[in-house]
């Protein structure tokens, strides 16, 4: 709307100043994620090795697609082993540096794949190709997901397994914990169970 009013002003139309307009913030909806069953179905799907590596990297670490594409062989080889996971620093959104932790078997699989090409990066597939392949997979499997859905799925599983929200925030590279709270998905059953705890407490005081 602001852009439209500026356009009108530049064309000589005397409209209301955009600074006088208050636009209420629309709350962000919960992040879309895959269920455990859908994850298993996805991993059983027959796909190109490079696409599988990209999916595994995003799904097992919460990396964005741009972060996965920039990951180099040298980074992996020099990664420090922490609690059975390889710690790698990636340059995320707004050029913020953060740590991601990659499972050993996925590191081995990624390096095995990367040996087949001469690029410095682990993945030798362009961004558009990954997006194109994912669209085909979603069509074949009958449920929608994007590269970012894989990141959402990783973060959702952490939250659902009772990980501290502030730790998940650091792993995700979010600027605030409010953004991370989008992964606090709750079913009607779970909400009812929580509400029942208070009701039980009140009844016990009668």
Where are these regions (language model features)?
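Basic, Lys/Arg- and aromatic-enriched nucleic-acid-binding interface segment
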Residues: 25-28, 36-65
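N-terminal DNA-binding recognition helix of tyrosine site-specific recombinases/integrases
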Residues: 1-19, 63-66
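Flexible interdomain linker/hinge and immediately adjacent N-terminus
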Residues: 10-41, 91, 116
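Catalytic-site neighborhood detector that most strongly recognizes the C-terminal catalytic loop/helix
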Residues: 33, 94, 172, 177-197
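Conserved tyrosine-mediated DNA breakage-rejoining catalytic core shared by Y-recombinases
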Residues: 70-109
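C-terminal secondary-structure termini that scaffold catalytic or DNA-interacting sites
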Residues: 199-206
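Major-groove DNA-contacting interfaces characterized by cationic-aromatic clusters
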Residues: 16, 89-91, 104-136
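Short, basic (Lys/Arg/His-rich) helix/loop patches that form interaction surfaces
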Residues: 116-121, 131-170, 174
């Amino acid at each position: 709307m602001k852009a439209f009013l500026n356009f009108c002003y530049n064309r000589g139309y005397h409209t209301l100043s955009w600074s006088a307009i208050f636009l209420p913030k629309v709350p962000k909806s919960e992040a879309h994620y895959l269920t455990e069953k859908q994850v298993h179905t996805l991993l059983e799907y027959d796909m190109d090795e490079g696409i599988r590596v990209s999916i595994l990297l995003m799904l097992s670490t919460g990396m964005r697609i741009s972060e996965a594409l920039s990951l180099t062989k040298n980074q992996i080889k020099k990664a420090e082993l922490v609690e059975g996971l390889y710690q790698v620093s990636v340059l995320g959104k707004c050029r913020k540096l953060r740590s991601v932790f990659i499972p050993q078997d996925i590191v081995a699989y990624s390096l095995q794949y990367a040996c087949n090409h001469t690029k410095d990066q682990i993945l030798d597939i362009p961004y558009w190709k990954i997006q194109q392949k994912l669209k085909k997979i979603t069509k074949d499997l009958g449920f929608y997901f994007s590269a970012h859905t894989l990141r959402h799925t990783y973060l959702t599983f952490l939250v659902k397994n009772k990980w501290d929200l502030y730790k998940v925030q650091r792993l995700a590279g979010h600027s605030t914990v409010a953004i991370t709270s989008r992964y606090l998905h709750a079913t009607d059953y779970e909400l009812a169970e929580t509400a029942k705890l208070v009701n039980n407490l009140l009844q016990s005081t009668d």
